[in-house]
């Protein structure tokens, strides 16, 4: 999972890859809340990172916050769960119909 994220800092200045111990704690929470497989998680993570690659990772969450992030009201949310749902629903991020052909 961690290796899918770029081995550099994001434009926000934070490392894209977080410490393994922090990720382990976040995944414990994730698996207690959601019923996804590691295969779903890897596919969803690759989809997420690939979406941001062309934008030089601008506004992308780091590996910890992608699993779970707590808002100011102490509510935990998971963008990873959203992307796992998209994988389960067969959603792709390829938007070829919006790309312009240049000849």
Residue ranges and their predicted role:
Residues 1-103:
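Append "and, occasionally, other polyanion-binding protein interfaces
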């Amino acid at each position: 999972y961690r290796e899918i994220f770029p081995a550099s800092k994001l434009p926000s200045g934070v490392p894209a890859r977080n410490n393994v111990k922090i990720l382990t704690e976040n995944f414990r929470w994730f698996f207690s809340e959601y019923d996804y497989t590691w295969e779903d998680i890897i596919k969803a993570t690759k989809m997420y990172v690939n979406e941001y690659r062309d934008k030089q990772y601008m506004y992308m969450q780091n590996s910890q916050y992608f699993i779970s992030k707590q808002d100011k009201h102490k509510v935990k949310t998971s963008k990873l769960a959203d992307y796992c749902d998209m994988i389960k629903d067969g959603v792709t991020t390829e938007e070829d119909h919006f790309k312009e052909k240049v000849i």
